[in-house]
């Protein structure tokens, strides 16, 4: 699939087009026209690329289609979190039976609770996730579920700390999330449609540490080139110090040309 190459070099729009074509071929094959190869993989690739391209409608629909096809709502939930559609997460009622998928789904529910003002619900979810990663031997493909879900657990813990005004604890949690994310082996698409550095960088920026935020966003762009979430964070980190980089501005404008959302930060 050409989209594996497009993802690696940050040509997210091309990846979306390639995987849309693959998805459509799968639909035709279901009608006896042509053949199908890896329909769930195609949908996962589509939602992943669209998430980094800012195409929320495409990403979230691919997540829903994945759930309908595979009976697993984890990607439906995480793409909705990526695009800040918390009311839709709270309305979900398709908790997976698989332990690892259920934990990812629970993270999304807990995060949406927090963003909707239910701190107690988010804290209860956090305890559940902490219990899961302490004991699980599950796998998500070839990744230890405790590592993938560990990333999410620390993101939720950090966001709870942000809500409580404890920036130091939040930064510590997000740093731990980044460390776990960095420990994951190469996989494409990755298990999550977002990066822990989006939370770390944005929190550093909000805490008045734009130089550190800049470094985080530049590191993130090495992992996912030309993604608007990190480019916006980088642009704002520079602006906070009275700096402007035309190359960054142009990259953001080009990379975010197909996006259907307005960015207020690197994460919702």
Stretch-by-stretch model annotation:
Residues 23-33, 63-70, 92-101, 130-145, ...:
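Solenoid-like repeat scaffolds
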Residues 1, 45, 75, 104, ...:
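"A position-specific structural signal for the A-helix of alpha-solenoid helical repeats
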Residues 7, 12-25, 51, 57, ...:
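TPR/TPR-like (Sel1-like) alpha-helical repeat modules
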Residues 36-40, 70, 103, 144-151, ...:
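Start-of-helix signal in alpha-solenoid helical-repeat scaffolds, especially tetratricopeptide repeats
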